[in-house]
């Protein structure tokens, strides 16, 4: 029997959930629980971690999961690695639904860095006005460069004081527009943009805006994840499911 587990949290995951529901697949959608108001899904939904590889192995076995689609954020490396290990142990088929990374276009002023520490080091020594578009989890890393003013864009309001001495938070959920991000960068007199190379259309607006304004971008490259099947499109995922014996209810 086909029973799918979708590891979600991205726009792609939501599109997949709708397609699976429309086609009558038995599936569960899982959120990590890092945002306060996750987008409602048309599938039964669970929120929270699994408890590492052992916990995920237990869940897959207990729930009779036949296929896992990892549609988490490209920077959710630990969850993705856990999924690879757990599926290998249980024999469950695994596919990553992963958007392609962004690639530089004419006019881009990108500096690629491997991690957050390198992103901090790539900022200038002189005080700058930095648009920090990396989410809330790793803001504290930038306290190593306290001379800068940081503009943050967060999905949820911060629960306490920001961990940076000179920072302001804008609360907003994407997708964002090029016009809106251009106006934001211009009105805040931003001099540098720091972002993760998440890929996808929903968050690309800030990079296009930075290009139009001639701003330098420090782009954090994706972390390494163990080898697994990868599909970059919804059609590719549905084809992978068919190739791996997944069928809707009653088929």
Curated annotation (Swiss-Prot):
The keyword Hydrolase does not apply. One of its GO terms (molecular function) is precorrin-6A reductase activity. Pathway: Cofactor biosynthesis; adenosylcobalamin biosynthesis; cob(II)yrinate a,c-diamide from precorrin-2 (aerobic route): step 6/10. Catalyzes the reduction of the macrocycle of precorrin-6X into precorrin-6Y. Keywords: Cobalamin biosynthesis, NADP, Oxidoreductase. It catalyses: precorrin-6B + NADP(+) = precorrin-6A + NADPH + 2 H(+). Its EC number is 1.3.1.54. One of its GO terms (biological process) is cobalamin biosynthetic process. The keyword Nucleus does not apply. Pfam families: CbiJ (PF02571). It comes from Rhodobacter capsulatus (strain ATCC BAA-309 / NBRC 16581 / SB1003). This is Precorrin-6A reductase. Belongs to the precorrin-6x reductase family. InterPro entries: Precorrin-6x_reduct. The gene is cobK. NCBIfam families: precor6x_red, PRK08057.1-2.
């Amino acid at each position: 029997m086909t029973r799918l587990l979708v590891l979600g949290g991205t726009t792609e995951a939501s599109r997949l959930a709708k397609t699976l529901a429309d086609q009558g697949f038995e599936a569960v959608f899982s959120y990590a629980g890092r945002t306060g108001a996750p987008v409602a899904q048309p599938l039964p939904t669970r929120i929270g971690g699994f408890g590492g590889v052992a916990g995920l192995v237990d869940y897959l076995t207990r729930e009779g999961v036949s296929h896992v689609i990892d549609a988490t954020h490209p920077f959710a490396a630990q969850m993705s690695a856990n999924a690879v290990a757990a599926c290998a142990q249980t024999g469950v088929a695994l596919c990553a639904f992963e958007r392609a990374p962004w690639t530089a276009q004419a006019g881009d002023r990108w500096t690629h860095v491997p991690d957050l520490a390198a992103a901090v080091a790539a900022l200038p020594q002189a005080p700058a006005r930095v648009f920090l578009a990396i989410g809330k989890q790793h803001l504290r890393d930038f306290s190593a460069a306290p001379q800068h003013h940081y503009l943050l864009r967060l999905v949820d309001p911060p629960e306490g004081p920001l961990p940076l001495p000179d920072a302001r938070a804008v609360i907003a959920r994407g997708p964002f527009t090029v016009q809106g991000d251009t106006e934001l960068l211009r009105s805040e007199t931003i001099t540098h943009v720091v972002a993760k190379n998440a890929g996808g259309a929903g968050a690309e607006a800030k990079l296009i805006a930075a290009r139009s304004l001639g701003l330098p971008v420090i782009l954090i490259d994706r972390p390494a994840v163990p080898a697994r099947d990868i599909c970059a499109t919804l059609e590719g995922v549905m084809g992978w499911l068919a190739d791996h014996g997944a069928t809707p209810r009653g088929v």
